[in-house]
Amino acid sequence: MINAKKEFQQRVRNMIPGMRRVHQIHFVGIGGAGMGGIAEVLLNEGYAVTGSDIAESAVTNRLISLGAKIHFSHAASNVDNASVVVVSSAIKADNVEVVAAHEKRIPVIQRAQMLAEIMRFRHGIAVAGTHGKTTTTAMISMIYAQAGLDPTFVNGGLVKSAGTNAHLGCSRYLIAEADESDASFLHLQPMVSVVTNIEPDHMDTYHGDFDEMKRTYVNFLHNLPFYGLSVMCADDPVLLELIPQVGRPVITYGFSEEADYRIENYEQTGFQGHYSVITPAGERIDVLLNVPGKHNALNATAALAVAKEEGIENEAILAALADFQGAGRRFDQLGSFIRPNGKVMLVDDYGHHPTEVNVTIQAARKGWENKRIVMIFQPHRYSRTRDLFDDFVRVLSQVDLLIMLDVYPAGESPIAGADSRSLCRSIRNLGQVDPILVTDTAELPEIMDRVLQDGDLVLAQGAGNVSKLSRQLVELWTKA
């Protein structure tokens, strides 16, 4: 087994040149999904990987099982033997390990710079956009795997069919989620770029200027070679505005009549989608998609367009989409449970922007007709709550019962008027739903049992620790 692993690593090394004089790579904040995925690929390439984080997680446990040495505290000594230090956007410049690395003249680079280095000698496919990039990255990865191309992939969330968010393949293909939150996707030099949509988010990075954000996306697309390909959603008005500025080959997809890959006759049956795609050549492809919602049909059609343009056969594309198990925390069905007032279903979803929350609600309505939608919502970041306050009020008013948790700060300080109590007040004033504010999560199980009814669909929604709370409910309800 060890010899087989070394043989595989050598084959990859023979195909992809290594990083000169880099032996040990240290990740500060290694437990983040994006960081952990890159670390896993580098471990499998044969590099020594160390890291630090403040708490154990499924990501850190997996990396340790693969051979990484991880410290669960930050200390200057953690970087002693590092050739390079990789940091996520959440790590501040005054972090003790970052300071120590600078003092020792050890290079300190962003996560995306390391991803760009992995991509440098590969055929890179980068997926960017405000919404849908994790799922789209997973779909493209599974199509390429189904076609026997054994791609390397690095995703921001779990690719459930593969059981991991990163994989080192033995082909020239690398499929990666591109992170616009800190504009670090500008480091990437792919052959194919997908942009799913653009909406205001992470506006602190762009100095509150949406035009600056749009210019940054155009610059990202300019990183393509002149013979590269940009795949863009024709349903997004911002992308339509930007297409004339791209200056590279562009293929579009969407429900729009103008789309090159056009979706027709979408229907949802339960939690599956059925529709047709008309290709630029006029071919009609009938798709069965194993995840719900029109937003996922868009994600899947982006993946289909990439695959078709790269010469992958329909059989592999359709098989991968029909069997697609989803991405972690993207409408993740955790099971059905018997509660005091009847049977309920629990779904965990990462969506934390009003647009994402809205499409999740719509998909749930289609798949769970005539049933109540009960949402446990945890706002993520005070700044996002402030910037999108009215949109959150409008979208969250669509559910039948809303249980609101405190804002997950993600390192931010509170902002007056951008808290959960203010959200609840404004939602209540609309008169469509009367939110229940839960400030002590220890009370959540008792509250749930009091308010749930037979047949309810419970959506645990948000990017903070609401997922952990949903898993605690699963554990508690399984024992009951």
Curated annotation (Swiss-Prot):
Catalytic activity: UDP-N-acetyl-alpha-D-muramate + L-alanine + ATP = UDP-N-acetyl-alpha-D-muramoyl-L-alanine + ADP + phosphate + H(+)
Pfam families membership: Mur_ligase, Mur_ligase_C, Mur_ligase_M
GO cellular component, one term: cytoplasm
GO MF annotation: an example: ATP binding
Keywords: ATP-binding, Cell cycle, Cell division, Cell shape, Cell wall biogenesis/degradation, Cytoplasm, Ligase, Nucleotide-binding, Peptidoglycan synthesis
E.C. number(s) listed in UniProt: 6.3.2.8
Cellular localisation: Cytoplasm
CDD domains noted in UniProt: SIMIBI
GO BP of this protein: cell division; cell wall organization; peptidoglycan biosynthetic process; regulation of cell shape
Binding site for ATP: G129, T130, H131, G132, K133, T134, T135
Gene3D superfamilies: Mur ligase, C-terminal domain, Mur-like, catalytic domain, NAD(P)-binding Rossmann-like Domain
Pathway: Cell wall biogenesis; peptidoglycan biosynthesis
Group of enzyme by EC: ligase
Protein family: Belongs to the MurCDEF family.
Function recorded in the entry: Cell wall formation.
PANTHER family xrefs: UDP-N-ACETYLMURAMATE--L-ALANINE LIGASE, UDP-N-ACETYLMURAMATE--L-ALANINE LIGASE-RELATED
HAMAP family named among the record's database cross-references: MurC
Protein name, entry field: UDP-N-acetylmuramate--L-alanine ligase
